[in-house]
A protein has these predicted regions:
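Non-catalytic nucleic-acid-binding interfaces of large nucleic-acid enzymes and RNP effectors
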Residues: 1-571, 575-649
Length: 649
């Protein structure tokens, strides 16, 4: 039982989380508005999401009237400029720019002419990129790869592409002119104002004329009605704004009647036992007991990996998922930069490259910086606890984002159990299993992993005694940070034997849990063996087998790149009812990581090949999926609102 002092300390920590979360939300909103990025705020995203379908419909209706000859000459004049742009793209661009300009802190930003010009310019920029895509698709793709992600902002990206296209003698884009841009922007702004008039309301935006000296200037301003919506969205966001950290005492138990986890959660209701679930559903006793059980496991920081991380952060050295901010120095200026035009151009180009790299460093290092902030807060805490909850599928997830067993390789390496287990011969085998698996032998038979660990005592000794000096020995392995933690634990518990208790976490993972469950439901022995439900001489790899089956049916240009990584997310998610649309994204992203661009047609063929391969390799689970889909469709047609069934087990 926690003492009153410990409870007070935890309540104070949660109040700090609430305070800091609110401050971060408000500071982030304020910073985005200062930078004219209100479209990225919480209220901006929610509002655009709500208004976008109505605006798309209005633009489509207007386009249809063109073909019916019902629009005036004024619209036909600007229609030519967006003829190649689908209504969804035009609507998204117009809404983004409207929110950015109207809620910007910059003086005059919300003048009607300024807003219309910004919308028209952004639409022209998009059309210009599509023009380059039609004229020189291969060149544009190369330029994007080499320059796009290095640039600091949207405008700079476009400028880079324009400059490089001009150097390649691509026919120059014929600019629309400011007058036409403003006309186009004004029409889209009118569409936004009209579309926001829900149920004959006053709408979200209106034109407001101000007399400034001898001039009359029109501004676009939010209506009182929208300000009420904005305040409501922000108030709702603040309920979920508190930061989520580990707890200093055991989390409250979850029940069907009371919220668990954080002490103040019962009052704040910021976290549900089932995320995105139906609040009317009653959860069973077994899953609730499971959730409450894992919340009582005490953890602490691993002083060895924390010390190594702090030193590498000081050195600015990247290792695996540990990405500290690396400072890129500007090149020295040439002595004749003032007189020598070529030297000046070369310097400016090199300086821009360095500035682009530095800009990306801050983004890239975000998770590492936040993890190290959490480390500083909990470094001197003897033990802490993780509150957990379910998602709507029944999978358990930690509520905090950092210092949890489901973190990155680096994040996981920072944790050990607060209470150790006495070393036994079985414990030695499990430590050997962990150090070999994280080194990269995760597909090797168990005996091979144990043997490898026994043959590499010298490696573990070198790494444990001088991890920084021997960085090349461990930075390139499969999971470098967990390997580092395992090597140090194995060294002290087995090689040196100066530790009688081990606190290291040993990770074992299900092989495609969706297929495992469906294999059991279908009593499919071959699939059960393929996903390691049934024992075998060595670990089976379902992803590799599906990839090999699918490869001959993929486009020839894609076949050399097909492997388990390309199909993994598809095979993992199909048992959870993932459809071809999401499959396309997974395969496209996996190929992009290999530097491979795939056309729409080839992507369609590849997705079909992978799904057909699953029908061949895992027929039982796929048949169960098909049966469930058919039964659900039949039930919906019959008017059912929910389904209940019993599994064969």
């Amino acid at each position: 039982m926690p003492t009153p002092a410990q409870i007070d300390e935890q309540v104070q920590l949660e109040r700090d989380q609430i305070r800091q979360g609110l401050k971060r939300l408000r500071d982030n909103t304020d910073a985005l508005q200062q930078r004219s990025y209100a479209s990225a705020t919480v209220y901006g995203v929610a509002s655009i999401d709500m208004l976008l379908p109505r605006l798309v419909k209005r633009i489509e209706d207007t386009n249809n009237r063109i073909h019916e000859g019902k629009n005036g000459a004024a619209f036909k004049e600007i229609a030519q400029y967006i003829s190649d742009l689908e209504p969804l793209a035009a609507a998204a661009i117009a809404l983004k720019l409207t929110f950015d300009k109207v809620f910007s802190y910059k003086e005059g930003s919300n003048q009607v002419q300024s807003v219309c010009d910004a919308i028209g310019s952004a639409v022209e920029d998009e059309c210009q990129m599509r023009y380059y895509e039609r004229c020189a698709p291969g060149l544009l793709n190369i330029l994007k790869k080499n320059y796009w992600h290095k640039s600091s902002g949207t405008k700079q990206r476009l400028t880079s592409i324009q400059t490089l296209m001009n150097r390649k003698d691509i026919q120059q884009w014929q600019t629309w002119g400011r007058s036409n841009r403003i006309k186009l922007g004004s029409w889209l702004l009118d569409c936004i104002i009209a579309s926001s008039q829900f149920n004959n309301s006053s709408g979200w935006f209106k034109r407001d004329m101000h007399q400034e000296g001898r001039k009359r200037i029109n501004y676009i301003v939010p209506t009182p009605e929208f300000l009420v919506i904005k305040d409501k969205v922000m108030a709702d966001a603040e309920l979920f704004a508190p930061l989520a950290w580990p707890m200093l005492i055991e989390p409250n138990d979850w029940t069907n009647e009371r919220a668990g986890g954080y002490l103040l959660n019962e009052v704040m209701r910021g976290h549900d036992m089932v995320r995105r679930g139906n609040h009317g559903c009653i959860q069973g006793e077994i899953p609730i007991n499971f959730l409450n059980k894992i919340q009582k496991v005490a953890l602490t920081l691993n002083p060895f990996t924390v010390q190594v991380a702090e030193e590498l952060e000081r050195l600015g050295r990247e290792v695996g998922k540990f990405l500290p901010v690396v400072q890129h120095e500007l090149p020295p200026k040439p002595v004749d930069i003032a007189e020598n035009r070529e030297a000046r151009k070369a310097y400016n180009r090199a300086a821009t490259h360095v500035q682009d790299l530095q800009h990306q460093e801050h983004k890239k290092s975000c998770r590492t910086r936040m993890t190290m902030e959490a480390v500083k807060r909990f470094k001197d805490v003897d033990k802490f606890y993780i509150p957990w909850s379910f998602d709507y599928r029944g999978r358990a997830y930690p509520i905090p984002a950092f210092l949890t067993p489901q973190d990155t390789d680096f994040g996981k390496s920072l944790l050990v159990f607060a209470d150790g287990s006495y070393m036994t011969p079985e414990a030695e085998d499990w430590l050997a299993f962990q150090v070999a698996t994280t080194f990269g032998l995760d597909k090797a038979p168990m005996t091979e992993r144990l043997e490898w660990a026994r043959n590499n005592h010298e490696l573990f000794t070198l790494i444990s005694q001088d991890p920084i000096g021997n960085l090349p020995l461990w930075e390139g392995v499969e999971e470098p940070w967990q390997f580092l933690a395992a090597a140090e634990e194995y060294y002290h518990c087995v090689v040196l034997a100066d530790r009688q208790f081990t606190r290291l976490m040993v990770a074992t993972d299900a092989t495609c849990s969706g297929l495992q469950i469906l294999a059991g439901l279908a009593r499919d022995k071959s699939t059960a063996r393929l996903v390691n439900v049934l024992p075998s001489d060595k670990p089976q790899d379902a992803y590799k087998v599906v990839s090999e089956e699918a490869t001959p049916y993929c486009p020839e240009s894609i076949q050399p790149y097909m492997d388990r990584k390309v199909v993994k997310r598809v095979v993992m998610t199909v048992p959870y009812n993932a459809k071809p649309f999401s499959n396309r994204g997974y395969i496209r992203d996996a190929l992009a990581e290999k530097g491979v661009e795939i056309s729409k047609e080839d992507l369609t063929k590849t997705v079909k090949a992978v799904r057909n391969a699953m029908d061949v390799i895992v027929p039982g689970p796929m048949a169960v999926m098909k049966w469930i889909e058919d039964e659900v469709a039949t039930a919906i047609k019959a008017g059912k609102e929910h389904l209940e069934w019993s599994t064969p087990s």
